[in-house]
Amino acid sequence: MKAKISDVAKIAGVSPTTVSRVLNNRGYISDETKKNVYKAMKEVNYFPNDIARSLFNKRTNLIGVIVPQTSNPFFGELVLHIESICASLNYKVLLCNSLNRIDKEEKYWEMLIRNQVDGVIAVTYNRGILDYHNQTLPIVAIDHYLSKKIPTVSSDNYSGGIQATELLISKGCKHIIHINGPIKLETPANLRRKAYEYVMNEQGKTPITYEISNTFDRKIQQEVICKLFDEHPEVDGIFASDDLVAASVIVEAQKRGKDIPTELKVIGYDGTETSQALLPGLTTIRQPIESIAKKAIEILTKEVEGEFNDLPLETSLPVKLLEGTTT
């Protein structure tokens, strides 16, 4: 027979009302009482009804997370931290892989609203598919600008761009090229390109940026990299938009007989655990992925609690240069 709240109360030596207050975190309950209630729950194998609790609290304790694709190391690691932090705060995560498709993203938004999520963390590229200005649902964006009213959390992309470009110059590179994602997207990541251009201009060098219109399409990525080498055989330094692009650059360069780092120096961006494990020698700018996840959740939970005062609209977290053997 399925255990009831009254069974838990009897074993714990408290009233059913007290058990309910413990489960819903309502009112003052001593640590000893909480301990006895949880012990009794475990003893009778009692699991609280999430639907009933959501009706009582007027919350579902669900957080929606929309990402382009978790197969990308950056997004995969980001989601891992988000899920872990949410679990520690008693939130469950509804994960949505949009594959950077507008139709999928729209359907996911509808699904999240139907499931009455308490809030959404959006790592989305398709700005404009929704009227974000009129969204009443608490939203925090990561690495993207969705609306002037929606908080954005990212790494310090400008500082990262400065450090990457200055490193290549300090290593003696004369012809440095930057590979960027879609420039038309209004994202903090575009600050990497602006920083690169600033340093190049300050040093009297001509900045050249190659754009990958869809960074998730390996074919397009490869075509851009090949075009870069064909048009600029003199290139001796490349600042890539992420570690995956940097890895592809290294592979193509080696196919063309270029020695890394003697003839070509390469630096990436992200510094995920996966990229560091597979390419331990890659010089890169490490994003504080766990800190980004923590800050996004911190802001979102404040929104959920109705604490809108003094919420930062833009949070930029420090990056770190990891110098390897590719520079």
Locate each region found by the language model.
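Hinge/beta->alpha junction and helix N-cap segments in small-molecule ligand-binding domains
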Residues: P68-E77, L95-D103, V153-Q163, I179-C226, ...
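Short acidic/polar active-site loop segments enriched in Thr and Asp
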Residues: S15, D118, C173-H175, D236
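Short beta-strand segments enriched in small/hydrophobic residues
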Residues: T18-R21, L55-Q69, L167, H175-P182
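Short acidic capping loops at alpha-helix termini that bridge into adjacent secondary structure
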Residues: H175, P207-T209, D259-K265
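N-terminal helix-turn-helix DNA-binding module of bacterial transcription factors
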Residues: M1-T60, F74
